[in-house]
C-alpha cells in the first residue's frame, strides 16, 4: 500500500513539473549556452553615399561577407580631370566652330593645308551675316585665325565693337575637285558689343569607353574621364507622352496630325 502511495505522489509531482514548464516556468541559467560571438553586437555600417562627381578618392569601410570573412567593397573610381585639356570647340555670336584638322579636311573633301576654324553650325547673328555651316574662318578683321586660341584672341580685339569683318573660305559642294572661294562678311551686334568667343573642351567619357574616332593621341589629352559632368539622360532624347483626348474626338476622326495609326496606340482616351 505504501509503495502505491509513493508512486502516486511521484506521478503527481512529475505532472505538475510538466504543466509548469509548458506555461513558461523559470528556466535555470545553466540551461542557456551563450556563444561569445553572439554576446557582442556587430557594428552596423553607416550608408555610404557616392557622389557622381568628385576628384578625391573615397575611403570605403570593409564589410563582412556571408562566409564570415571581411571583404573590401570596390569603390568607384574618382573622376579624372586633367589640368591641361586641348580645346575642342568655340562659340561666338551664333558660330559653333572647331579646329580644322587634316582628319576633318580629308573627311569633308577640303584641300590639305587649310587652316582655321571650321563652322559646324551657325545661328543668330552669324546666320544673319551670311555665314554658312562648312565655312572656315581664317581672319577676323586684321588678325589671322589658325587655331582655337587665336580665334578667341581675335574676338577679344573686337569684343567692344558693334561690327567686325569675318574672312572665310567656302567650299563648293559640287562633287569632284574642291573649289574654294574666299569671302568676307560683316558680323554685326545690335547692342552690347560682339563679346568674345567662349572655348570648351571635349565631353567627359566613361572609363574604358570605345573610341568613336581615329587615333588622336591619349584620350586624356582631350577628355575628362568619369561621370557627372553631363546631364543624363539628354532631355532632347526624351519623348513625352501625348495628351489625353476625348472619345468624341476619336469618333469624329478629329486629329491635329496626319494618320499615324489608331488613336489609342498613343493617347489616353477619356
Curated annotation (Swiss-Prot):
Comment on bound cofactor: Binds 2 heme groups via the magnetochrome (MCR) motifs.
Primary location recorded for the protein, binned into one broad class: membrane
Any single Gene Ontology cellular-component annotation: plasma membrane
Top-rank taxon, per record: Bacteria
Phenotype caused by lack of the gene: Intermediate magnetic response, few large magnetosomes with magnetite, makes many very small, irregular hematite crystals. Near wild-type localization of MamC. Deletion of approximately 80 kb of DNA, including this operon, leads to cells that are non-magnetic, lack internal membrane systems, grow poorly, have reduced mobility and take-up and accumulate iron poorly.
Places the protein is found: Cell inner membrane
EC number, as in UniProt: 1.-.-.-
Residues annotated to bind heme 2: 263, 266-267
Cofactor (UniProt): heme
InterPro entries attached to this UniProt entry: MCR, PDZ_sf
Chain intervals for the UniProt region annotation (PDZ): 84-201
Motif mapping: MCR (magnetochrome) 1: 205-225
Lipoprotein listed as a keyword: no
Cytoplasmic-facing ranges: 1-6
Spans traversing the lipid bilayer: 7-20
Disulfide bonds: none
Enzyme type, top EC level: oxidoreductase
PTM statement from Swiss-Prot or TrEMBL: Subject to proteolytic cleavage which requires both MamE and MamO.
Recorded topology in the membrane: Single-pass membrane protein
Keyword field: Biomineralization, Cell inner membrane, Cell membrane, Heme, Iron, Membrane, Metal-binding, Oxidoreductase, Transmembrane, Transmembrane helix
Role played: Involved in redox-control of magnetite formation. Oxidizes Fe(2+) at alkaline pH; successively forms ferrihydrite (Fe(3+)(2)O(3) 0.5 H(2)O) then magnetite (Fe(3)O(4)) from an Fe(2+) solution.
Note: This bacteria makes up to 60 cubo-octahedral magnetosomes of about 45 nm in diameter which contain membrane-bound crystals of magnetite (Fe(3)O(4)).
Similarity annotation: Belongs to the magnetosome MamP family.
Name recorded for this polypeptide: Multi-heme protein MamP
Name of the gene: mamP
Amino acid at each position: 500500500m505504501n509503495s502505491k502511495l509513493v508512486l502516486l505522489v511521484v506521478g503527481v509531482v512529475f505532472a505538475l513539473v510538466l504543466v509548469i514548464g509548458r506555461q513558461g516556468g523559470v528556466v535555470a541559467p545553466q540551461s542557456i549556452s551563450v556563444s561569445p560571438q553572439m554576446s557582442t553586437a556587430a557594428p552596423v555600417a553607416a550608408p555610404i553615399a557616392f557622389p557622381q562627381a568628385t576628384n578625391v578618392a573615397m575611403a570605403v569601410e570593409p564589410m563582412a561577407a556571408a562566409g564570415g570573412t571581411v571583404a573590401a567593397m570596390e569603390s568607384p573610381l574618382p573622376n579624372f580631370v586633367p589640368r591641361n585639356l586641348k580645346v575642342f570647340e568655340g562659340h561666338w555670336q551664333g558660330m559653333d566652330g572647331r579646329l580644322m584638322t587634316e582628319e576633318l579636311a580629308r573627311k569633308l573633301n577640303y584641300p590639305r593645308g587649310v587652316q582655321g576654324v571650321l563652322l559646324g553650325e551657325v545661328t543668330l547673328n552669324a546666320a544673319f551675316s551670311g555665314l554658312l555651316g562648312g565655312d572656315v574662318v581664317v581672319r577676323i578683321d586684321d588678325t589671322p585665325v589658325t587655331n582655337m586660341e587665336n580665334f578667341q584672341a581675335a574676338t577679344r580685339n573686337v569684343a567692344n565693337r558693334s561690327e567686325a569683318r569675318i574672312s572665310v573660305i567656302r567650299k563648293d559642294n559640287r562633287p569632284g575637285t574642291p573649289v574654294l572661294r574666299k569671302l568676307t562678311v560683316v558680323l554685326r551686334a545690335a547692342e552690347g558689343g560682339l563679346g568674345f568667343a567662349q572655348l570648351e573642351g571635349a565631353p567627359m567619357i566613361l572609363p574604358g569607353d570605345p573610341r568613336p574616332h581615329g587615333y588622336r593621341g591619349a584620350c586624356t589629352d582631350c577628355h575628362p574621364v568619369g561621370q557627372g559632368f553631363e546631364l543624363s539622360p539628354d532631355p532632347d532624347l526624351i519623348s513625352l507622352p501625348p495628351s489625353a483626348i476625348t472619345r468624341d474626338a476619336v469618333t469624329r476622326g478629329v486629329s491635329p496630325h496626319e494618320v499615324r495609326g489608331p488613336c489609342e496606340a498613343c493617347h489616353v482616351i477619356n
